[in-house]
Regions:
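Conserved two-metal-ion catalytic palm core of "right-hand" nucleic acid polymerases
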Residues: 1-138, 142
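Active-site palm subdomain of RNA-directed nucleic acid polymerases
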Residues: 142-153
């Protein structure tokens, strides 16, 4: 589903309102509290290096070496396939990232960012509650909210 550009701008303004954006960024910061999870910005830029070299070194230092260290520490590894993740996201699950599923069902704290995100994505998807639009950095960011919460739980 392609997002209407006017609606995209409106949605961006809603979620970047100072109070809402602060809650969203705090949630992302909470994902960093577990040393088993690593996040990385792409592309990686370092002084006096080409972007390709910096990206390779970042991968080597942050992912490859850490994976080897964890492989020595743990007996098992869970590997998942999330290739069908975007089309299967339930829009109401954005609320569950910020408040409990039970509170969301009781309609408590309807002003949380998850409710805002879920309802706007649902409108973009012709009021369907399954799936989010593909190909947008904004949707990648929101999908990461759900994946981060899954990692924590």
């Amino acid at each position: 589903t392609l997002i209407n550009p006017l609606y995209y701008v409106y949605f961006c303004r809603k979620i970047t309102a100072p109070t809402t954006w602060e809650i969203i960024t705090e949630k992302f910061k909470s994902f960093e509290s577990n040393d088993l999870f690593t996040r990385s910005s792409i592309p990686v830029r370092k002084d006096n290096s080409s972007n390709i070299a910096a990206s390779v070194m970042n991968w080597w230092e942050d992912f490859e070496q850490k994976s080897l260290a964890l492989a020595l520490e743990y007996e098992f590894m869970l590997s998942t396939d999330i290739s069908n993740f975007y089309p299967s996201i339930y829009t109401h699950s954005f609320e569950w990232v910020f408040i409990s599923k039970e509170d969301a069902k009781k309609k408590k704290n309807k002003n949380n960012p998850g409710g805002l995100i879920g309802s706007h994505i649902q409108m973009m998807m012709n009021n369907q509650t399954n799936g989010i639009p593909l190909g947008s950095t904004l949707m990648d960011t929101f999908a990461e909210l759900i994946l981060g919460q899954i990692d924590i739980e």
